[in-house]
Amino acid sequence: MNLLFLNFKGFVRLMTNGVYYKKTFCIGRENVPEKGTPVLIASNHQNALNDALGFLLTINDRKVHFIVRANVFLLAKAADKYLRMLGLLPAFRMDHEGLNAVSNNGATFHDSEEALIEGKTVVIFPEAGHQWIHWLGNFSFGYTRMAFEAAEKTGFTKDIKILPACNHYSKYFDFKTSLLIRYGTPISLEPYYDLYKVKPRTAQREVNKLVREQISSMMLNIEDVDNYEAIDYIRTSEFGDRFAASQGVGKDDLPARLESDKKLVAALAAQEDTAKLYEDSMNVVEFLKKKRIEDVNIAKNSSALSVALRFIGLLLLSPMALACVWPSVPVWIIPRYLQKKTGDPMYRGSFLIGISCIFTLRILGLVTLLAVGFGLSFLGHAISWPIAVAYVLLFPAIGLFEWAWCYWCRELFRDMRARKVRRSEDGRSMLRLREDIFSRMDKICKSE
C-alpha cells in the first residue's frame, strides 16, 4: 500500500471514527479470509459512500477494491485517477449514465476479475443502488458471474470465495450515530465449479441464494415495505426502547439493539391482522410530523425547570458558538446544499464525510493557516505560526462543539413544542392513542 493511500486511510479513519460516528462496531472480522485469498465481499447497501468506508476501515491488512457508481469518476480526469488509486472501480448504470455507457462495465469487470485472480479483495453491492430503508433489495447476478469468470480464467484452479457482509446504522441521517459492520461465513465456489461448467446460470442462482440468505439473516430486513414507516415508528419509539431494555440491551450497544429490533419486527410479521395497529401508528407519525417533534421528545416529558436551565446554558454558550462559526458553517452547509441538489437524502452523510471531512476541511485548514499565520506576523505577533497551527488542529473540536450547540438548541425547541402538545386537547388524544399502541404491542410481544 503506497504512502498516499495510507495517508488517505488514516485521515478518513480519524474523521469517521473520531468525528463523524459516535461508535463503530465490527463483528466477524475473523471470518475475513487471510490476505492473498481471492475474496469477493457482497454486502447490502444501506447508505452511499459510508458503506464503502465502513469496509475500508475494518480490513486493515490490505488494500480493498470497491465497485461503485460511475458518476463520481466522470467529474474530471484527476478524480478518475485519484479514485482508482484508492481502489475504486466504476459501475455504469443505464438509468444514470445511459445505455451507451453500460458497455464500459466490461473493463470494470475485467479489472475486478484480475484483482481476484491476483488474490485481492473486492467489495460489491449486489443491489446496485443504495436503499433508503432497512430492507434488502433485489440482487443482480453480476457479482456471481464475475466470481465464476475469475475462477474460469484460472482454469478453475483457484478457490474464489464470496464473503457475505452487512452494514447497519443506528440512524441514517443524523451525525454522531453508530455504525455496525458484520462479516458472515465465507462461501467457497469450488464445490460449484462442475455445475457451473454445464449450467452456469443454475450455479450462480444457488450461490446467490446462499449469499442473500446470509446477508438477510445478519441485517434488519423489514420486508413489509408497504407498512415500513409504521413498523419503523414502533421500532424506534419509546416502546422499542422499552422492548430493547427488557432484552438486556444497553443504550449504546448497537449489535444487541439490532437483534432486539429483529425480534420485534419478527413478532409483528407473525401477526395475521396488523392493519389497525399500523393505521393508528401512522396517525401518530403524521401528528408528530405536523408538530415538528419526535417520539423521544414526548417520552422525555421535560419539565419547565429543565427547559429554562437548558435555555440559560445555551445562551451562555452562544458567544463560543458564534466564535466557532468558522470553519463550521461551510463544513456543514456545503454537504447539505449538495445533498438537496441530488434529491437523495442518503447522500447527506456521504457528502459530509467525502467532501467536508476529506477535502473541504483540508482546504479551509490551509487557507486559515496561511491567513492567521501571515496576519499575525504582519501585526508583529511573536508566535504567529504556532498559534495558526494550533487553531487549525482544533478544527475538528470546533466543528463538534458547533454541531453540539445547534443540536442542543434543536432538541430544546422540540421539547418546548412537546410540552405545548401535552397540554393541548389533540395532543392528549394522541398520547392516549400512542399508549394504546404500546399496550397492544406489549400483548403481541408477550404472545411470541
Language-model features, listed with the residues they occupy:
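Transmembrane alpha-helical segments and their cytosolic interface motifs
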Residues: 296-330
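Long, charge-rich alpha-helical interaction segments
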Residues: 202, 209-300
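Soluble catalytic domains of membrane acyltransferases
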Residues: 2-202, 320-448
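Short, well-structured alpha-helical interface segments that form or flank functional binding sites
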Residues: 142, 206, 314
